[in-house]
A protein has these predicted regions:
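Conserved pre-ATP/AMP-binding loop-to-beta segment of ANL
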Residues: 21-22, 154-187, 194, 217-223
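Conserved ATP-binding/catalytic segment of the ANL
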Residues: 64, 382, 396-397, 401-455, ...
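Conserved ATP-binding loop and adjacent catalytic segment of the adenylate-forming AMP-binding
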Residues: 250-253, 338-393, 397-400, 408-411, ...
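Conserved C-terminal "lid"/linker of ANL adenylate-forming enzymes
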Residues: 478, 486, 523-563
Length: 563
C-alpha cells in the first residue's frame, strides 16, 4: 500500500483518485458507475460552489439524506475543503434536526428531497445555503416542498461544472489540512436534553480505518453494498472511507432493503463485503431458517440432536450464502450483541461472519476479527495500536468497565466541556460505559454499566445475559430486562407472524389467542428461569405488542420502557 502523506481525508482521496482512477468508486445498484477520477472531479465541483458562497476551513456543513453516491461526494467535498461535516440521521424528527443545525452552527445543508420537509419551516437566516443533494441544485429561500420540483426546474442553478484549469486550483493544498483538524461532528441523539455532538478528527477516522485493515484487508476487487445509515460512524468509517482508501466499489440501494429489494440486488452485485447490525441476521434466522428446520415433529426431533442440528445449519447456511450472491468473504456485525442461537447457526454453517465492538466516540472500532479467527460470543481482539484496560475488574469474574486510549478516541463533545470531562479519567482514558472481560486477547462484552442490576446480596445481574436466553425462544423476536420495584421484569415482543401463521390453520378465536399468549409468556418465563441463576430469575413478564422503538443502528431505546 502506498503510504499516505498524512492521515487526512484529503490525502486519502487524492491518493485513491490516482491509484484507482478508472475503477468504480460508487454506484446505485442499477445505475451508471462513478469512477474514482469522476468522483474526485465531482468533489471538486461541490467544493468550488462552497468556496464561492464563502464556506471555508472550519465552517460546519450539514448533510441530511438517505444513502446515495452523492452523500459520499458531499462528505468528501466538505472534509477535504477543510470544513466540518455534520451528518444527520434521516430518522431524526424535525425538532431534532433543527436542534442539531442550531447547536452545530451549520452554515449550509445538503438535503434530499425526501428529507426537505424537515427544514421547510426553518427560518432562512439559520441556514443560509440549502442544496438539494439529489442533483446538487441550489434551493432558493422560502421554497416549500410543494413547489420544490417546479421551482428547481425554473429558477435554480446547478453547481457549476469546472473547467480543467479551474479543477487544478480548487480547494486547499494537502498541507493546509492537519491530522488534528475536525473532520465531522456526529450527533448520537437529536433531542436537546441528550444531544451529544461527537467531534472526530481526520486522524481519528483514518487511523481507525488503517487499524481495521490489519484485521481484515480490503482490496480493489472488493464490492460493498451499503445498508446502514451513513451518518453513523460504523457505516461512514468502515463502509465509505475505508473502501475508498483501498479502491473498492460501493453500491447503494434506492429503496429500503426489504427482501424483495435486497435479494435481487445481492444477486446482481454479488458483494464480497457487507456491514450489518445483529437484527438483520436475527430476523432471517427467526422468520425463515428456524421455522423451516423445525416445521414438523420429525424435523424438530432432528434439530434437537446437536450433530444433526449442526448438519441442518450447514445446509441452510450454504443456501443463505448463495442467496447473498455467493461471493461474500466478510459479513461484519456490529452495533449490538448478537443472539447466541444465531451466532451458533453462523458458526455451524461456516458463514463468513465476524463481530466487532466500538462506539461513535472511538471512530468507531475498538476490537474486531476476521471470519477465520472468530471466537464464540467474542467481539474479537483489540486493534493493535490501541490500548484497552478493564477498569475496576471483579476479582472473581474479571469483569469491569472497558476503557480505551489511543488515536481513535474523539476530541470532545461539541460545546459540552462538562460531559467531555465526565467520560475521561484523570489519566486520559475514555470510559466506554460498557462492561467486558479480556480472555487470551479476546474481548467479551457483558453489557452496559448503567443497565446492571444489583441483586439482594450484591450480585451483578446483567440484563443482556437474560435477554439472550429469552430471545432464543422461537416465539420471541426481542426483549428487554430491567428492575422495577425491586423485581426483575422482562418485556417481550413475540414473533406474531409465526404465531398467527400457526393459529390461522387452527382458526383460533381472539379469546383463545389471548389465553394462548398468556400461557406462552409464562412458559417463556419458566424456561428462562430454569437456565439462569436464582438471583437472575424473572419475577414478572410483560407482553410488548408493538415493536420496540429503536435507534438507527437498531438498538432498543431502553429508557422508553424502563423509566
Amino acid at each position: 500500500m502506498k503510504e499516505l502523506e498524512r492521515l487526512t481525508l484529503k490525502c486519502v482521496l487524492e491518493r485513491s483518485a490516482v491509484l484507482y482512477a478508472a475503477k468504480t468508486c460508487v454506484s446505485w445498484v442499477d445505475g451508471k458507475p462513478i469512477r474514482y477520477n469522476e468522483f474526485y472531479e465531482q468533489v471538486k465541483e461541490v467544493q468550488l460552489f462552497m468556496q464561492e458562497e464563502g464556506i471555508g476551513k472550519g465552517d460546519k456543513v450539514a448533510i441530511l439524506s438517505e444513502n446515495s453516491p452523492n452523500w459520499g461526494i458531499t462528505y468528501f467535498a466538505i472534509t477535504t475543503l477543510g470544513a466540518v461535516a455534520v451528518p444527520i440521521l434521516p430518522d431524526f424528527r424535525n425538532n431534532e434536526v433543527h436542534h442539531i443545525l442550531r447547536h452545530s452552527g451549520s452554515k449550509a445543508i445538503f438535503i434530499s428531497q425526501k428529507q426537505f420537509p424537515k427544514i421547510e419551516e426553518l427560518e432562512s437566516d439559520l441556514i443560509k445555503h440549502r442544496i438539494l443533494i439529489d442533483d446538487f441544485t441550489i434551493i432558493p429561500p422560502e421554497t416549500t416542498i410543494a413547489k420544490l420540483k417546479s421551482t428547481i426546474s425554473k429558477t435554480t442553478r446547478p453547481l457549476a461544472k469546472l473547467t480543467d484549469s479551474a479543477l487544478k486550483f480548487t480547494g486547499l493544498r494537502s498541507s493546509d489540512i492537519k491530522e488534528e483538524d475536525i473532520a465531522c461532528i456526529l450527533y448520537t441523539s437529536g433531542t436537546t436534553g441528550n444531544s451529544k455532538g461527537v467531534v472526530l478528527t481526520h486522524k481519528n477516522l483514518i487511523f481507525d480505518s488503517l487499524e481495521v485493515l490489519t484485521i481484515q484487508n480490503i482490496v480493489e476487487a472488493d464490492r460493498f453494498v451499503s445498508l446502514l445509515p451513513l451518518p453513523h460512524t460504523y457505516e461512514c468509517t468502515l463502509g465509505l472511507i475505508m473502501p475508498i482508501m483501498q479502491g473498492a466499489a460501493i453500491h447503494y440501494l434506492k429503496k429500503l432493503p426489504t427482501p424483495s429489494v435486497l435479494l435481487p440486488a445481492l444477486q446482481k452485485i454479488k458483494p464480497t463485503v457487507m456491514l450489518t447490525v445483529p437484527l438483520i441476521m436475527e430476523k432471517i434466522f427467526k422468520n425463515k431458517i428456524h421455522p423451516t428446520l423445525t416445521a414438523n415433529p420429525i424435523s424438530k426431533a432432528f434439530y434437537s440432536f446437536p450433530p444433526t442440528r449442526k448438519l441442518l445449519h450447514y445446509i441452510a447456511g450454504k443456501k443463505l450464502y448463495k442467496s447473498f450472491g455467493g461471493k461474500l468473504h466478510f459479513y461484519g456485525i456490529g452495533g449490538a450483541l448478537l443472539s447466541p442461537d444465531v451466532e451458533r447457526f453462523l458458526r455451524d454453517s461456516k458463514f463468513p461472519y465476524a463481530i466487532g465492538y466500538g462506539l461513535t466516540e472511538t471512530s468507531p472500532l475498538i476490537a474486531g476479527s476476521n471470519p477465520t479467527l472468530t471466537k464464540y460470543r467474542s467481539t474479537g481482539t483489540i486493534l493493535s495500536k490501541i490500548k484497552v484496560r478493564i477498569y475496576d475488574a471483579d476479582s472473581k469474574t474479571g469483569e469491569g468497565e472497558i476503557q480505551v486510549i489511543g488515536d481513535i478516541v474523539m476530541k470532545e463533545y461539541y460545546k459540552d466541556p462538562e460531559r467531555t470531562k465526565e467520560v475521561f479519567t484523570d489519566d486520559g482514558w475514555f470510559k466506554t460505559g460498557d462492561l467486558g472481560i479480556l480472555k487470551n486477547g479476546y474481548l467479551y462484552i457483558k453489557g452496559r454499566l448503567k443497565n446492571v442490576i444489583i441483586g439482594a446480596s450484591g450480585e451483578n445481574i446483567y440484563p443482556e445475559d437474560i435477554e439472550s436466553v429469552i430471545n432464543q425462544h422461537q416465539d420471541v423476536l426481542e426483549s428487554i430486562v430491567y428492575e422495577a420495584e425491586g423485581k426483575i421484569v422482562a418485556r417481550v415482543h413475540l414473533n406474531y407472524e409465526l404465531i398467527d401463521k400457526e393459529h390461522k390453520a387452527k382458526r383460533t378465536n381472539e379469546k383463545k389467542m389471548r389465553e394462548f399468549i398468556g400461557n406462552l409468556l409464562q412458559e417463556i418465563r419458566r424456561g428462562v428461569n430454569s437456565q439462569v441463576s436464582t438471583f437472575s430469575s424473572i419475577k414478572r413478564i410483560i407482553e410488548q405488542r408493538e415493536p420496540f422503538v429503536k435507534t438507527p443502528t437498531k438498538k432498543i431505546k431502553r429508557y422508553l420502557y424502563t423509566e
